[in-house]
Amino acid sequence: MADEKTFRIGFIVLGLFLLSLGTFLMSHDRPQVYGTFYAMGSVMVIGGVIWSMCQCYPKITFVPADSDFQGILSPKALSLLETGLSEVKSPQPPYVRLWEEAAYDQSLPDFTHIQMKVMGYSEDPRPLLAPELKTGASSVREGEPRTAQAWMEAPVVVHRGSDENEGEKSHSQSSPSVGPQGSAPLASFHDDLDVGSSEGSSLQPSPNRDEPHRQVPWASRGPLDRFSDFALIDDTPTSEDTVLDGQAREAALPRKQQWSLRMKGETVQARAEEPEQEEEDLYYGLPDSPGNPLPDKELGFEPDIQG
């Protein structure tokens, strides 16, 4: 290895010497001589540099796994390899035999005897909660001691919430009155009362506020109507709806009449106070006189009379 390194260095130095010799001969005007030295020196320098660069990388040696080539390695290297392999610990668990795995699978508990029963909220779960001792039927041969396999049953009772039961009851109560479901009806706001009636109702307190609210028992209360402000367009009105609409219109009509009479009185009073001259001053067209709209006296000339 040292001889090879020395040879590479000498090769590069010889190439540099040839380059310097060619430069010296070039000064004496001999082109056929210094060209040869230049070419040889450049080739030797480039080759030596590339050779040195290739030797900087580590060498890869392939060792065959055949037993015939074990004699090539020294006994010291073999001992080092054996000690290194013994020190390395494999992360894998030790090998488990198949019969041990089968025995472990058989030792696991069997959950086939578990049963599930759905109970309502009103049912009593105490009969199920009472522990029962059962003995499993095992095949017992004659002459062998009889071993009783016993286990305890621990039932888990899960009740459905009261909200679900109330929802089911309300659904069952409302289902007979509901007809066959078709297309979903449209919805709209109640616009029977106009703005005037709403303003009049806001000025006058409603008589319904003075009436005490009826106490409705909690049991008879159904789910809250969240869409009470909507009216179904496609839905056919029932008798109760028509009665309620008639009462609302009757209560709204006197308020509307009072408001309209008040507005009419105010407009008549305002018209009486305005002078008629102001109306004539604001008129920009021809006067509404039954006669000639353009009298001759205003024109300032007499029409020609041809007799």
From Swiss-Prot:
Q: Which UniProt keywords apply?
A: Cell membrane, Lipoprotein, Membrane, Palmitate, Phosphoprotein, Transmembrane, Transmembrane helix
Locate the compositionally biased regions of type Low complexity: 172-183
Q: Name one GO biological process term.
A: intracellular potassium ion homeostasis
What superkingdom does the record give? Eukaryota
The subcellular localization recorded is: Basolateral cell membrane
Which spans does this entry mark as compositional bias, Polar residues?
A: 198-207
* Listed transmembrane segments: 6-26, 33-53
Q: Which residues form a coiled coil?
A: none
Annotated Basic and acidic residues bias: 161-171
What are the GO cellular component annotations?
A: basolateral plasma membrane; membrane; plasma membrane; protein-containing complex
Cite the record's note on assembly. Answer: Interacts with CLCNK channels. Forms probably heteromers with CLCNKA in the thin ascending limb of Henle and with CLCNKB in the thick ascending limb and more distal segments.
Name-wise, this protein is Barttin
**Organism expressing this protein natively:** Mus musculus
